[in-house]
């Protein structure tokens, strides 16, 4: 009885006296706890929640996306562009006999910074580039911004015939160089739709005719729409800010006459299929080049004339992170 009286009567009374002595009350204590929880919720709301998988790969179709790759991971790219479908069935089997290929590697120095290199059979071009994710979309930042810079060298013998039909003669190796830089700006609107802008500056040390500028600016736009968990539709378009020849003008290019070659804006459509560590990209495009200098600055294909090239990209990701591999054992 004494113990029951002590626990049921004296302890609660003592607790109430202590609260009154401290100048508070049980109700104030509960209110203080609620205020503390509210402050914690507010602090958590301020912490950024980053958007992931704006795009499934570091390339959209021909061009780059804002995506980088994880630290100590390696991407291996295989890209094919076949000949134009208007090249005929008997002569080239609708372009299958005129395939161009690019092999490329990308390595993640950090989760936001990668370096890449590749070799394209078109003009036997070697390219190097780097990308850095400057801003990441989150609950406080509406967009992702990635900066990219690249360099390429044309290793064809001097005097070769370009895609434009004109000869290209190099006086030294410096004339073989080209450079490009991009600011990739994208937003993931929801789980299905992502859009991207790609302002691009390209400089080519040697062009085939004085009427063609060494430097050009292009504004690209692209996006993707997810049909399912693994299948995505994609598109991209690069508008080059310089005078283009009329699509209906069939005059041949005359390098010596100063007539600017009818370089075209690149327009591409694709379907992406993701299967585990692989990404398969199938597309139709009027650009056969796979380096920025080629598919933006020197694109000769015209959708209106049937210069449509079909091709594909295959990307395979490998983890070189020993700690991550050991954690899965």
Where are these regions (language model features)?
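N-terminal secretory signal peptides that target proteins for export/translocation
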Residues: 1-9
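Intrinsically disordered, low-complexity segments enriched in Ser/Pro/Gly/Ala and basic residues
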Residues: 3-4, 24, 185
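Bacterial N-terminal signal peptides
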Residues: 13-25
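Sec/Tat signal peptide C-region and signal peptidase I cleavage site
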Residues: 26-32
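Transmembrane beta-barrel domains of Gram-negative outer membranes and organellar outer membranes
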Residues: 33-171, 176-181, 187-197, 201-205, ...
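A contiguous binding-surface segment within folded domains or other stable secondary-structure elements
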Residues: 209-247
